[in-house]
Amino acid sequence: MPIKIENLTYTYMPGTPFEKKALDNVNITIEDGEFAVFIGHTGSGKSTLIQQINGLLKPTSGSIFIDDVDITDKSVKLNDIRKKVGLVFQYPEYQLFEETIEKDIAFGPRNMGLSEEEVSTRVKKAMKMVGLEYNDFKDKSPFELSGGQKRRVAIAGVVAMEPKVLILDEPTAGLDPKGRDDILYEIKKLQKEYKMTIILVSHSMEDVAKVADKIFVMYDSRCILSGNLDEVFNEIDTLEKVGLAVPKVTYLVRKLREKGFDISKDIFTIEAAKKEILRVLESAKR
């Protein structure tokens, strides 16, 4: 489901002494099935933007087209949009409340007025989609689980409503390295296997490098840079000027290139660096 944002501006508390422009003439396009990541410091406009896409906030001016429908039009029913665009807030596990995992995931679909048979089908499917074995987890309390497992349950609760677009605000925040990798793996799988359009907000450049098809850099309420991994992460000077960085391994590769090693500059993950360094070492032996 493609998303197009045109000339989007949003002002908090307009006409008061506390007036603040959170988004300023933002223009972006996210293609159907794309994995888009927004990066930027706190206050740059990332979270405000994703709430606009879900219809939680109404823009001061501009348009948001989701599947060619302008959701800012007064005739559009926002409940219909929210069925298509799922939003997972930061630390979503704090919203878990039911006695069992099955009941918690079923809450959303059940409130959509679906039959119990359809609700059950969706719960099983959603649990499978996020890597939770139904029979092993369905009767457990959400509060027995690890942080990473709780987060999967929370994501499954949104996925069970079968959105075409899934938005996640800092989904790996507070998790240990294994938990981060597990969550990213499951989210990437949702995109690849189930053809979801994914929008993710992140502060971790390492996480971004593992999953992004397209990156949008937010700074001071504007989108100042966008493109694929190569296009954005090769703009090191621009990123550093706004207080951001590239993955640490990219700085290592840059140093090796300065020392004369014939290594590709487009290296953004540890796995890619490992392969490239081994290639160079093997070439040196010949």
UniProtKB/Swiss-Prot annotation:
Q: Which domain of life is it from?
A: Bacteria
Does the keyword Cell membrane belong to this entry? yes
Print the keywords alphabetically. Answer: ATP-binding, Cell membrane, Membrane, Nucleotide-binding, Translocase, Transport
Taken from the UniProt entry, a GO cellular component term is:
ATP-binding cassette (ABC) transporter complex
Keyword DNA repair listed? The answer is: no
Where's it found, cell-wise?
Cell membrane
Q: Where does ATP bind?
A: 40-47
- Topological category with respect to the lipid bilayer: Peripheral membrane protein
Extract one GO molecular function annotation from the record. Answer: ATP binding
Residue intervals of the ABC transporter domain: 3-245
The EC number(s) this enzyme carries: 7.-.-.-
Which top EC class applies here? translocase
- Give the protein's function: ATP-binding (A) component of a common energy-coupling factor (ECF) ABC-transporter complex. Unlike classic ABC transporters this ECF transporter provides the energy necessary to transport a number of different substrates.
* Subunit structure as annotated in this protein's UniProt entry: Forms a stable energy-coupling factor (ECF) transporter complex composed of 2 membrane-embedded substrate-binding proteins (S component), 2 ATP-binding proteins (A component) and 2 transmembrane proteins (T component).
State the similarity comment: Belongs to the ABC transporter superfamily. Energy-coupling factor EcfA family.
PANTHER family recorded: ENERGY-COUPLING FACTOR TRANSPORTER ATP-BINDING PROTEIN ECFA2, HEAVY METAL TRANSPORTER
The protein in question is named: Energy-coupling factor transporter ATP-binding protein EcfA2
From which source organism is this entry? Clostridium acetobutylicum (strain ATCC 824 / DSM 792 / JCM 1419 / IAM 19013 / LMG 5710 / NBRC 13948 / NRRL B-527 / VKM B-1787 / 2291 / W)
Query: Which gene underlies this protein?
Result: ecfA2
